[in-house]
Design a protein with these regions (language model features):
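Active-site-adjacent beta->alpha loops and helix N-cap segments on the catalytic face
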Residues: 15-17, 38-53, 66-72, 89-116, ...
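Structural motif
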Residues: 27, 53, 80, 154, ...
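Conserved anion-binding
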Residues: 3, 69-73, 78-157, 165, ...
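Glycine-rich phosphate-binding active-site loops on the catalytic face of alpha/beta enzymes
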Residues: 80-94, 186, 193-226
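Short, acidic/polar
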Residues: 13-25, 68-76, 138-150, 195-202
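N-terminal glycine-rich anion-binding loop in soluble enzyme alpha/beta folds
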Residues: 1-24, 28, 104
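Active-site beta-loop-alpha junctions enriched in small/polar residues
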Residues: 9-13, 35-39, 64-66, 90, ...
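Hydrophobic faces of well-ordered beta-strands that scaffold small-molecule active sites
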Residues: 4-10, 32-34, 57-61, 85-87, ...
Length: 239
């Protein structure tokens, strides 16, 4: 039985590779993330394929531009039918408010459910040293909280952040704010290139709403068994 708190990242570049993953996981996974690599290579057929197979879609394109451009982009992605869409928090409150309004208006016109908009806080590839090297003045955790509060005030539904900041965001933004966490690594998996990581159970205990996991599942020798072990760990934490 799939647990919709688990989102599997389709970090591949072809439809064939995507279809292979979705087929291999079958009914064990109900939610997938389509990012830049796959969407830029194969376009909206990626989303349509997942929808046709009864899957939810997290479209992680990290929109970041002037408010009008982002608003038009969100309108297009709303028509496409994505369930979750990401917006860069560094674009500021005017941009985020424009995105929220565009999603609401487009969904109303089409008579469909509005996608949830998630603000990107600080990418999980950053550690303190690399963050400082690009001019980050606040500590990472403080910047994440600042952007999360700004996102909520601007009409965003939640954030994407490291699980290490999830507890602070949950306390700052309340029980209904979505917290989606990449950088999740079960005990049997390597950490790869992400610095701020956590296990599935610790992330959920600290307030994460949904977990994004890619390589520990998609590159596993037995992907469905990897999913089973992860869901088993997740279910030890009450929804």
């Amino acid at each position: 039985m799939a647990d919709d708190r688990l989102i599997v990242a389709l970090d591949v570049s072809t439809m064939d590779a995507m279809k292979s993953i979705v087929s291999s996981l079958g009914d064990s996974v109900s939610f997938y993330k389509v990012g830049m690599e796959l969407f830029y290579a194969e376009g909206d057929q990626t989303v349509r394929y997942l929808q046709e197979h009864g899957k939810h879609v997290f479209l992680d394109l990290k929109l970041h531009d002037i408010p009008n451009t982002v608003a038009h982009g969100v309108s297009s992605l709303t028509r496409l039918g994505a369930n979750l869409i990401t917006i860069h928090g560094q674009g500021g409150p005017i941009m985020m408010k424009a995105a929220a309004e565009a999603a609401r208006e487009s969904a109303e016109k089409l008579g469909i459910e509005r996608p949830k908009l998630l603000t990107i806080t600080v990418l999980t590839s950053f550690d303190d040293e690399s963050w400082t090297s690009i001019g980050g003045q606040l500590p990472i955790a403080d910047q994440v909280i600042r952007l999360a509060k700004l996102a909520k005030e601007s009409g965003m539904d939640g954030v994407v952040c490291s699980a290490l900041e999830a507890k602070m965001i949950r306390e700052a933004c309340g029980p209904d704010f979505l917290i989606v966490t990449p950088g999740i690594r079960p005990s049997f998996a390597a950490t790869n290139d992400q610095k701020r990581i956590a296990t599935p159970s610790s992330a959920l205990q600290d307030g994460a709403s949904r977990l994004v996991i890619g390589r520990p599942i998609t590159q596993a020798e037995h992907p469905q068994e990897a999913v089973r072990l992860i869901i088993e760990e997740m279910e030890s934490v009450s929804k």
